[in-house]
Amino acid sequence: PSATPPAPPPAPLAGRATTQLVFSVTLPPLSVSTFFVRSLSENEVAQTTALAEAAEETGASESDTNDGRAVSVSLDPNDGSLLVDFVVDATFNLTAKITAAFYASHDGSDGFVPSGAYVFRPDSSQKATPLGTPSFDPAASRVFRSGVLAETRVAFGDWASVAVRTWSKERVPHAEVEWTVGPIPVEADGVGKEVIVRYSTGLATGGTWATDSNGRDMQPRRRDHRDDWTFRNASEEPVSSNYYPFGSIATLTGDERAGFHLLTDRSQGVGSIRDGELEAMVHRRNLNDDWLGVGEPMNETQCGCRECDCPGLVARGTHLIAATTPATGPRTYRELQTRSQNPTQLAFAKVNGWEESIRGGSRRAVSVFASGAAPRNVHVVSIDRLPGEDCARGGACARIVLAHLFESEGCVGYDEELSAPAEVNLADFFPGRSIVAVEELTLSGTPIRPGDAVVTLEPMQIRAAKVEFA
């Protein structure tokens, strides 16, 4: 089945799509799959239920939910915020409230550095300002349902929106949060703005959370604390001093009932300013230079000018959110991480005679791997075909890089089952080829020692090898 919900706001830009096409497929690992898309005639639309448009409802109420097996979405009737309910286990459900807000950028009038390209420094005399109208406007919400997905969308004023999607037949229960922000208005008040999406869960986290380090080890964080020096900055900079970079994963820890996990499709700043909350900065527009060398404010516009009336940039991105028991958290966020950080690569071409192509079998997926080549705790970082001069025996050769996804016992990312050492047979990645030699490499490609076709990876280990074929 497929669906064609309208594209999300804000106001249309030149050349911007007005409709989305969504459909559900199964893609084998490292494979090439071909799909044919065409417009149906009115008669075909009437006869074809598989390509029916998603139903749309306006002014969703408290009873409007997107039903997934373990995830449902509704709207708070009091303020219109999005509520995502997760079934953690038989005894506990966790509800995450999604809101959007902005911090006013500090202008540096106190003699210290202003907020800018290299510095996040909000005006600490003000709390984050919620986006949207003071009273909930039901017309600002939309609900779409189809056999493929259920989507609830809320507009926060006229320059920000959030859509939450749940997909049918999902192996790892989670919700997809698509945020769209911009153009950020600064003309009326002359104040720069730092826009966040906030997730409030009610978990008793005791000021603790964790973020990834370059997508690998999870680093414990504690509010208003540093392990190796006395922290004295909490009262002056309570927000920015508790922000950390995360390129992939942030997770709330400390509550024995559940963990809440946030995954991003790009590097962002994240903080847990209050217990049970995570907030990610998604967009910024500053009006002051931060005195750190650029010599201009981070005031990006659609025209590329800064001293002009052109509107600011529109940014769009995706978060994945999930809630689990503490024990199953690492396996959930590591699997979602591989999806978020390694999206499917898309290519498009105009096709003539598509019916003949379908009958000829060109829809069939072509996969490089043998079934089950990579264990669940191993990620294939890359496979590269090497030039002939790098192949000592004059034949074909390739470089493969493998990474263990889980951490050792005692670490945040430890999983009782999947943190065990993983054994991989390189021959499974090259079905139909005969391996004659294996050489272990550094990650930069320098030879280390002769290797073996069977490779063992310890927790968090990354290994590279050159494989030569007969």
Describe these PLM feature segments.
Residues 1-470:
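C-terminal (or distal) subdomains of carbohydrate-active enzymes
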